[in-house]
Curated annotation (Swiss-Prot):
The RNAP catalytic core consists of 2 alpha, 1 beta, 1 beta' and 1 omega subunit. When a sigma factor is associated with the core the holoenzyme is formed, which can initiate transcription. GO terms for molecular function: DNA binding; DNA-directed RNA polymerase activity; ribonucleoside binding. Belongs to the RNA polymerase beta chain family. Keywords: DNA-directed RNA polymerase, Nucleotidyltransferase, Transcription, Transferase. PANTHER family: DNA-DIRECTED RNA POLYMERASE I SUBUNIT 2 (PTHR20856). One of its GO terms (cellular component) is DNA-directed RNA polymerase complex. It comes from the Bacteria. The gene is rpoB. This is DNA-directed RNA polymerase subunit beta.
Length: 1167
């Protein structure tokens, strides 16, 4: 058996591929984002303001409607000193771990210049633990990062229409589209009706054709001459400037308008009027548009808006604004000045439009502005540059954007999501403050009277409690915790929805390389929408995912590492990291595999600019824990990644014999280990305390004490337990693990056990992925786990008096109350079974039905004779175990309980679950199955030296599934077992077949890893040799004890009176329509009659038959099923009067009301 406390020396065994970079902290995405939100670095630079500071800046100052007073913000502070409870106390008491937010606010009066200053409490902000989680109402939660469409400009071609959208963070969506039939460009505001592009530009103030032409085209001067060649060259050109000539009266008059096409008779006119030069559009000029779309728009204007030529020959700004407003707000009268200001505010003021830091960055990058534009609103240049670029896309000079490219999708982490939530809450607060300003007395008013924190508190509570992105932490094991914090979700508010997301969004995209894992994603409707971050990826300041690369200069890999976003990466050739790189970084091959823009080729090392930092940079943490991943089919690798997260922590965990080197990092960053704060010497170790004397202590008393958590319940009811791994006298460094957590061993992740496997069918017990396992595995507790259930009860105040905890429970035998103390609470250490009382509690019964005799007795004997009901907390069905803890929260001791509750008692029951038939087990390669039989070890097939196998898997489960990694892992594991070696074989650099064969030879096994096996039952040799190895197997959180369920009678649905469904409701099975058909087919009339009536929903018949069974009398006839009554009531709901009569013509009552009416009728007829 694997010895506990054994030190493990892992050796690298693989292809010697250089790793240029250590793994970063794996939960940085959570911690850094929240620190930015809390502004821990206290940035005050205007351009860098984000998080809480930006929330205050966008809301304040708040001015009253008549502008006589204003609330001004000075600064905020987080009052860390007044945090009342620690993380553990918050968990026990069901509270939120948070810090009070206070803000210094001035109330400024304009007339008197008086300032009233106050430090105002603005609510509690939940704090993130150092593990990257939040504790909300006593439960650990994680805020998952969201991946969404980046603000900015997008050019697309959908359903045959070329369009572009400027997507803001907040504000009006501006779209442009090209009408291909008529070759016109249109603008759309918030997806309303179309507005001609040039009309929209005129509304913005570009009031003449000349101005509009200058935005899109370069111009050139042309001579007018009767020369034939020059004459013909001018035909078909377009005027860029108006042409004026002198009239007879000496006045200048416009002869031709800019935007007109030149015809031969125009040239004749010009020659006649002695015009020597004209300015025309140079379509082929640098930065000019080679398209007549804008000119077509001018022609369209003439048709649609026919101005009075005597006054003006083209639409004015006023005409354009009227046209725009007839689309935005049809039917609303608006003045010219208001319309102009409103349109300006719509795009160019920060109050109404915000493209965000990201949107601005994207626009600057797209349109190559010579000096970067600052600010987060649009500028006019953005609008016409977007139109120009769209026309270039249409004529094929530019390409459309790929919406799934990671340059167009960005990450919103906790901090940003929280900022958005608070901004909305603060704007509600602002509205309330404005209303109060106009209604309060100015003399006595204080800042506190104006600010209401209700919307802020409610928004925070709602976000953490109910948002789709705030999730109950997946805490089955450390890996599940870690991956949950690194998850990226495309769903949620402002994201996609499952039903509308197509294949393209879910697909693996070439930009995912090194940023998002192509393997780890759920199976089912969320596939591709929920993904994991790759190992080395990080999020940059704009929210885009970046991957690290090593710079390559002249075919030599330097040690310089650069992070590239998906947009930057598109420009370079990026080489693959391989074993052909020398110690000095020189690439010793003529050709290197590389990629650019999703194409994979081989080129000379001199031509590549960057190189991957590590082979495992393309996958996520879960996938990089699978050895020999490169030999598995991707679908099975996906299952393997997902199932490792479901592995239940075992009582005696063991790290994998064939690991990947990620086990240490994964356990370290998950936050389950206890790490030393300072270097020093261990002075004291017990099961729950470690004391370390630091090297650089202030004095002898300055010691670090660490308290370990014992037998804590996790969110998924597994056991969270820490145990020391250092001894007295050991020297430890700062950051070194000193205690293991759940599913870890010596600071390494240990999700399962290494067991001896044979791939051999055995009497059909491993048919269809079933697993045959040896009893030795159960006997030695190899796969035993502890599960902890929490049951709680409230002691309430009722209308008839308070409930009472007591061990004096009516009608209960002394024996059933043996384990309760004087207050009726079970003692710790008791073994309990279903139905046992955990907390004795009685509730007063209503006294309305008491007889006068009882009242007399009550008045004589007082409380004792009063009737009480037994409402004790009992062990639910299917639960048994040992009581390990009882926690009590009392109102009179200052605990915050819900209204009407005086005390809450929580009882924790721990159950030891051994492996049994029906439990789900799996390897790391997606090879899963159910335990079908546990065989005595003497009956298991055994090797020539007498060693029986631990587990038999079906060989047919390997070839069709194409997960050969399990075979290679088993071979190397077998050699490791014999040689007592532990291997580190990282993904994509795992040992070759020759290396594995060398190890097998060294261990004295055949290189095929096939040995002769004997049948345990007969002792005879199997016909063929059998493949034997050591495989790492996990027990998954799908335990048969949690799924098995039986019911005799139980709760019924109120309306239909049919049993409820499901184990959680202690439900039964419904005999539905199809089951009735089956019985009808057999003509089983009597069975059917009782199944449909008295065994099901005939309430009257049900109680009658029960009575007759108890009394031993013959059963009475059946009554009317409740479902029939439901049908009758539905018909009555349709205003159809529905009554039933028996053979004698008497009405049969269907409801209690019917009974009353029939009784009334009888009594009235009797009179």
């Amino acid at each position: 058996m694997f010895a506990r406390g054994q030190k493990i020396d892992r050796r690298y065994y693989g292809k010697d591929v250089p790793n240029f970079m250590e793994l970063p902290n794996l939960i940085d995405i959570q911690i850094q984002s929240y620190n930015k939100f809390l502004n821990k670095e206290k940035k005050t630079d205007e351009t860098e303001i984000e998080g809480l500071e930006s929330v205050f800046h966008t809301t304040f100052p708040i001015e009253s409607t008549n502008e006589d007073m204003a609330l001004q913000y000075l600064s905020y502070s987080l009052d860390y000193d007044s945090i009342k409870f620690s993380e553990i106390e918050c968990k026990q008491k069901g509270l939120t771990y948070s810090v009070p937010l206070k803000a210094e606010i001035d109330l400024f009066f304009k007339e008197t210049k008086e300032i009233r200053r106050k430090n105002i409490y603005m609510g509690d902000i939940p704090l993130m633990t150092e593990r990257g989680t939040f504790i909300i109402n006593g439960a650990e939660r994680v805020v998952v990062s969201q991946i969404h469409r980046s603000p900015g400009v997008i050019f697309s071609h959908e359903k045959g229409v070329y369009s572009s959208r400027i997507i803001p963070y907040r504000g009006t969506w501006l779209e442009f589209e090209i009408d291909q039939k008529k070759e016109l460009i249109y603008a759309k505001l918030d997806s309303k009706k179309r507005i001609l592009g040039t009309i929209f530009l005129r509304a913005l103030g570009y009031d003449t054709r000349e101005k509009i032409i200058d935005l899109f085209y370069k111009t050139k001067t042309a001579k007018i001459s009767p020369d034939r060649t020059e004459y013909e060259e001018l035909i078909g050109q377009v005027l860029a400037r108006d042409v004026y000539v002198k009239g007879e009266d000496g006045e200048k008059r416009k002869m031709h308008q800019a935007g007109e096409k030149i015809h031969p008779h125009n040239i004749d006119d010009l020659i006649q009027n002695d015009v020597k030069k004209i300015t025309i559009i140079d379509f082929k000029g640098k930065d000019s548009l080679d398209s007549q779309i804008i000119i077509n728009c001018f022609e369209r204007e003439e048709i649609k808006y026919t101005p009075d030529p005597a006054v003006n020959d083209e639409p004015t700004v006023e005409d354009a604004l009227n046209a725009v407003y007839s689309v935005i707000r049809p039917g609303d009268p608006i003045t010219y000045e208001n319309a102009k200001e409103d349109l300006h505010n719509m795009f160019f003021t920060a109050r109404r439009y915000d493209i965000g830091k990201v949107g601005r960055y994207k626009l600057n990058k797209k349109f190559d502005y010579s000096d970067d534009v600052k600010g987060t609103t649009l500028i006019e240049e953005d609008i016409f540059k977007t139109m120009k670029f769209l026309i270039k896309v249409y004529i094929g000079e530019e390409s459309i954007d790929d919406i799934d490219h990671l340059g167009n999708r960005r990450i919103r982490s906790v901090g940003e999501i929280m900022t958005d939530v608070l901004k909305k809450a603060f704007s509600r607060m602002e509205r309330i403050a404005r209303d109060r300003m106009s209604s309060k007395e100015m003399d006595t008013i204080k800042p506190k009277d104006l600010i209401s924190i209700k919307p802020i508190v409610a928004a925070i509570k709602e976000f953490f409690g109910a948002s789709q992105l705030s999730q109950f932490m997946d805490q089955v094991n450390p890996l599940a915790e870690l991956t949950h914090k690194r998850r990226l979700n495309a769903l949620g508010p402002g994201g996609l929805s499952r039903d509308r997301a197509g294949f393209e969004v879910r697909e693996v995209h070439y930009t995912h390389y090194g940023r998002m894992c192509p393997i780890e994603t759920p199976e089912g409707p969320n596939i591709g929408l929920i993904v994991s971050m790759a190992n080395y990826a990080r999020v940059n300041e704009y929210g885009f995912l970046e991957a690290p690369y090593v710079k390559v200069v002249n075919g030599v890999a330097t040690r310089e590492i650069e992070y590239l976003s998906a947009m930057d990466e598109d420009k370079y050739f990026i080489g693959q990291v391989s074993s052909a790189i020398g110690k000095d970084g020189k690439i010793n091959t003529d050709q290197v595999s590389c990629r650019k823009l999703g194409d994979y080729t081989s080129i000379s090392p001199k031509d590549i600019q960057y190189m991957d930092v590590s082979p495992k940079q393309i996958i996520s943490v879960s996938a990089s824990l699978i050895p020999f991943l490169e030999h598995d089919d991707a679908n099975r690798a996906l299952m393997g990644s997902n199932m490792q997260r479901q592995a239940v922590p075992l009582v005696f965990p063991e790290p994998p014999r064939v690991g990947t080197g990620m086990e240490k990092k994964c356990a370290y960053d998950s936050g389950v280990l206890v790490k030393a704060k300072r270097s020093g010497k261990v002075e004291f170790v017990s099961s729950d305390t470690i004391i370390i004397a630091p090297e650089k202590g202030k004095n002898k008393e300055d010691k670090d004490e660490y308290t370990l958590l014992k037998y804590q319940r996790t969110n998924q009811e597994t056991c969270y337990h820490q145990r020391p791994i250092v001894n007295v006298g050991d020297t430890v460094k700062a950051g070194q693990p000193i205690a293991d957590g759940p599913a870890t061993y010596n600071g390494e992740l240990a999700l399962g056990r290494n067991i001896l496997v044979g791939f051999v069918p055995w009497n059909g017990y491993n048919y269809e992925d079933a697993i045959l396992i040896s009893r030795r595995v159960v006997k030695e507790d190899m796969f035993t786990s502890i599960h902890i259930k929490e049951l709680s009860t409230d002691v309430r105040e009722t209308k008839l008096g308070a409930e009472k905890m007591t061990c004096d429970i009516p009608n209960k035998s002394e024996k059933s109350l043996d384990d309760l103390d004087s207050e009726g609470i079970i003692r710790i250490g008791s073994k309990v079974k279903p139905g046992d009382i955990l907390v004795g509690k009685v509730t007063p019964k209503s006294e309305s039905d008491t007889t006068p005799e009882f009242k007399l007795l009550n008045s004589i004997f007082g409380e004792k004779a009063k009737e009480v009901r037994d409402t004790s907390l009992r062990v639910p069905h299917g639960t048994e175990g040992t009581v390990i803890d009882v926690q009590r929260l009392k109102r009179d001791q200052g605990d915050d309980l819900s209204p009407g509750v005086d005390e809450v008692v929580k009882v924790l029951i721990a159950t030891k679950r051994k492996l049994r038939e029906g439990d789900k087990m799996a390897g790391r390669h997606g090879n899963k199955g159910l335990v079908a039989r546990i065989l005595p070890e003497e009956d298991m097939p055994y090797m020539e030296d007498g060693t029986p196998l631990d587990i038999c898997l079906n060989p047919l489960g390997v070839p069709s599934r194409m997960n050969i990694g399990q075979i290679l892992e088993s071979e190397l594991g077998l050699a490791g077992l014999k040689l007592n070696e532990w291997y580190e074989s990282p993904v994509f650099e795992s040992p070759s077949m020759e290396q594995i064969e060398a190890k097998l030879k060294e261990a004295g096994y055949p290189t095929s890893s096939k040995v002769k096996l004997r049948d345990g039952l007969t002792g005879r040799l199997f016909e063929n040799e059998v493949f034997v190895g050591v495989i790492y197997f996990l027990k998954l959180a799908h335990l048969v004890d949690d799924k098995m369920h039986a019911r005799s009678t139980g709760p019924y649905s109120l309306v239909t009176q049919q049993p409820l469904g499901g184990k959680a409701q202690f439900g039964g099975q419904r005999l539905g329509e199809m089951e009735v058909w089956a019985l009808e087919a057999y003509g089983a009339a009597n069975t059917l009659q009782e199944l449909i009536t008295i065994k099901s929903d005939d309430m009257h018949g049900r109680s009658k038959i029960y009575e007759s069974i108890v009394k031993g009398e013959p059963s009475s006839s059946a009554g009317i099923p409740e479902s029939f009554n439901v049908l009758v009531q539905e018909l009555r709901g349709l205003a159809l009067d529905f009554t039933i009569y028996d053979a004698k013509g008497q009405q049969i009552p269907l409801t209690e009301r019917d009974e009353e009416l029939i009784k009334r009728e009888k009594t009235s007829t009797n009179f």
